[in-house]
UniProtKB/Swiss-Prot annotation:
GO terms for cellular component: cytoplasm. This is tRNA 5-methylaminomethyl-2-thiouridine biosynthesis bifunctional protein MnmC. The keyword Cytoplasm applies. In the N-terminal section; belongs to the methyltransferase superfamily. tRNA (mnm(5)s(2)U34)-methyltransferase family. In the C-terminal section; belongs to the DAO family. Its EC number is 2.1.1.61, 1.5.-.-. Its cofactor is FAD. HAMAP family: MnmC (MF_01102). GO terms for biological process: methylation; tRNA wobble uridine modification. InterPro entries: FAD-dep_OxRdtase (IPR006076), FAD/NAD-bd_sf (IPR036188), MnmC-like_methylTransf (IPR008471), SAM-dependent_MTases_sf (IPR029063), tRNA_MAMT_biosynth_bifunc_MnmC (IPR023032), tRNA_MNMC2 (IPR047785), tRNA_S-uridine_synth_MnmC_C (IPR017610). It comes from Escherichia coli O6:K15:H31 (strain 536 / UPEC). Residues 1-245 are annotated as: tRNA (mnm(5)s(2)U34)-methyltransferase. The gene is mnmC. The lineage of its organism: Bacteria, Pseudomonadati, Pseudomonadota, Gammaproteobacteria, Enterobacterales.
Length: 668
């Protein structure tokens, strides 16, 4: 699944003000009463009004083909809110809507289309505010304070459904089979789509569609649905409804990357940084009971404790998984931070990455060739850099207009405070020594003879993650680094954006009139003592990259103000998020994996033990989406990521890649 810009919908508005696709010569909704048609066909056809109060689970999942203007989603959301108001004690608490759209509307067209339905304005405005960039892949939108989740998959539905992770199999309670009419858009209405719908449908799941075409009914029956006709809406004579009355066999396509969750809803998190904080929120939103154990006397004393950190995506033309992950992680992070109800120092001032030498210029040229939306990344010539950044550099580069900087320490502290208000229990100065399986959970042994037992455990303790017997073989490494804090000058005060070169320089923080220059890099080190050599090195890298500008030479590090931290990283620059893999069992079970892929069992893991680690230097970008991915996995909910990209986050990936090629694997 190559990551690329998505072509927006090519539409016009007819005399009635209804959007019409020029490419498909079809309306997006009925000229007569599109809202009532949606209520009749999709809500009524799936019997949702009757099913909501009787639903035995806290989450109801709806999937849709063709998001269009979002009319179906907004109508359902309105109905769900009305249900929750009428049945506050019902088991069902949250709505999850998954939709596929090949040609998403431009935001301006979306806003115009929504003017048709003033009664939906409270819901439409929330959707408009979070409308994502036109990037292929999954965009998760958290709406109504997380009670409603919208997964927008941009791209061709027949391609996307073949690339979904197995976590979506048998999760859908109701299908809205929508889109332009089969005669107008035959490429969508395929047997592959019908088969995918059946695979994703939960036993007892339903479907409804406006069409009564015979080939659609027969195709859905062949896929496994029991179909029937129903009176159509308005002038349409008939429509189709269906139910999945059987449990279909579901072979796992890549068992070595299989992910497992739990229905226990109780977990301990080991850590005290941004990963722990954001995962706590994500689990609490799903109704979990969460306890956090932090080795330090306060949060954010490790790698998450910096004053300023840059937020921008890590892009690579030669690594599709890296590009897909960080593009979507970045856009999710911006939406997430904007809606987070806590205060933290930040400025979405933009980030400009500069080509200071031939190698970096070539890298930037390759990134710019990837057909990315201008809202995400755009080229900037040397003569324009000073205009957008405020300082001269004599370098061209790439700018991320939605990037910027934020204070990780303040973010972490305030998110944990919010989580405590929502029920999080926190224990400080609890240094985990070891953990072992006990009955149906985990026994945690802390320094000072303290013990605790929990159903599930998540290790999110940064570079210390490999200190346990279960994790000692993980291929992660520590990186010590020092960030220099420098006072502003008249020239530095002009800096309007974060500059990235062979290091980074932030605009001044109004809270302290200082800039941050970072960071030194010592692979394999866990040293956190101040280093004057590192301080001078941070300054010298800035001068070496911009030798012709005077302001760089005026940077003053003599005050010896700095912060030292240790990051956890991997050689492929991607986080490790998911089940903790069992190294010894993996080598035994997969000894012949290269020759016997068809006989492979599910990946050997430690039951109910998870990890959220190796965020490297891009944790501010990756942590929000990673927290959402892991919380969804642990809760056995749909995961907002395609299978191949999700595999690239699997903690066992580096071992499995070698085993698939018949190569030897070494610990660490």
């Amino acid at each position: 699944m190559k990551h690329y810009s998505i072509q927006p919908a090519n539409l016009e508005f007819n005399a009635e003000g209804t959007p019409v696709s020029r490419d498909f010569d079809d309306v997006y909704f009925s000229n007569d009463n599109g809202l009532e048609e949606t209520r009749y066909v999709f809500l009524g056809g799936n019997h949702l009004e009757a099913r909501f109060p009787e639903h035995p689970h806290p989450l109801f999942v709806v999937a849709e083909s063709g998001f269009g203007t979002g009319l179906n989603f907004l109508t359902l959301w309105q109905a769900f809110d009305q249900f929750r108001e009428a049945h506050p004690q019902a088991q069902l608490q949250r709505l999850h809507f998954i939709s596929f759209e090949k040609f998403p509307l431009a935001r301006a067209d979306l806003v115009l289309a929504h003017q048709h339905w003033p009664e939906l304005a409270p819901w439409a405005e929330q959707l408009q505010a979070q409308w994502p960039l036109p990037l292929s892949g999954c965009h998760r939108l958290l709406l109504d304070e997380g009670r409603v989740t919208l997964d927008l998959w941009f791209g061709d539905i027949n391609e996307l459904t073949s690339q979904l992770d197995d976590s979506l199999n048998q999760k859908v309670d109701a299908w809205f089979l929508d889109g332009f009419a089969p005669a107008k858009n035959p490429d969508m209405w395929t047997q592959n789509l019908f088969t995918a719908m059946a695979r994703l449908a939960r036993p007892g799941g339903t479907l409804a569609t406006f069409t009564s075409a015979g080939f659609v009914r027969r195709g859905l029956q062949e896929a496994g649905f029991t179909m029937q006709k129903r009176k159509g809406f308005g002038r349409k004579r008939e429509m189709l409804c269906g139910v999945m009355e059987q449990t279909l066999p579901l072979p796992c396509s890549t068992p070595w990357f299989n992910r497992t969750g739990s229905n226990k809803q109780e977990a301990a998190i080991i850590g005290g940084g941004i990963a722990s904080a954001l995962l706590s929120l994500a689990l609490l939103r799903r109704g979990w009971q969460v306890t956090l154990y932090c080795a330090d006397e306060a949060p954010a004393l490790g790698a998450s404790g910096n004053r300023q950190g840059a937020l921008y995506p890590l892009l690579s033309k030669h690594d599709e998984a890296l590009n897909r992950f960080f593009s979507n992680a970045f856009t999710f992070a911006r939406r997430f931070y904007d809606l987070l109800p806590v205060k933290f120092d930040h400025d979405w001032c933009g980030v400009t990455q500069l080509g200071w030498d031939e190698k970096s210029q070539h890298k930037i040229a390759q990134m710019l060739s990837m057909d990315l939306p201008a809202e995400l990344a755009v080229a900037v010539e040397a003569n324009a850099v000073e205009q957008i950044t405020g300082v001269a550099t004599n370098c061209s580069g790439i700018t991320y207009p939605q990037g910027g900087w934020l204070c990780p320490a303040e973010l972490t502290r305030n998110v944990l405070e919010l989580a405590q208000q929502q029920g999080l229990q926190i224990h400080y100065q609890y240094q985990l020594q070891d953990l072992s399986r006990k009955d149906d959970g985990w026994l945690l042994n802390f320094a000072g003879d303290q013990q605790a037992t929990h159903s599930l455990v998540v290790l999110a303790n940064g570079h210390q993650i490999s200190r346990f017997s279960q994790t000692s073989s993980l291929p992660v490494y520590s990186v010590a680094g020092q960030v220099s804090h420098i006072p502003t000058t008249p020239e530095l005060a002009k800096l309007k954006q974060v500059l990235c070169y062979d290091g980074y320089l932030t605009p001044q923080n109004p809270a302290n009139q200082h800039h941050c220059i970072g960071a030194s890099y010592h692979r394999g080190s866990e040293e956190t003592a101040y280093s004057d050599e590192d301080q001078q090195q941070n300054r010298q890298r800035l001068i070496d990259c911009f030798p012709q500008v005077q302001w760089a030479k005026e940077v003053d590090v003599s005050g010896k103000e700095a912060r030292c931290g240790v990051r956890c990283a991997t050689r492929d620059h991607l986080p490790m998020v998911g089940n903790v893999p069992d190294y010894d069992a993996t080598l035994v079970e997969y000894a012949s994996l290269a020759e016997k892929k068809d006989e492979a069992v599910s990946a050997p893991v430690y039951d109910d033990l998870f990890m959220f680690a190796a965020l490297g230097s891009r944790g501010l970008c990756s942590a929000p989406l990673c927290a959402e991915i892991l919380a969804a996995q642990m809760s056995e909910e749909p995961i907002p990521m395609d299978a191949s990209t999700l595999a690239a986050l699997n903690p066992n990936r580096l071992w499995v890649r070698k085993l698939l090629k018949g190569k030897a694997v070494k610990a660490g």
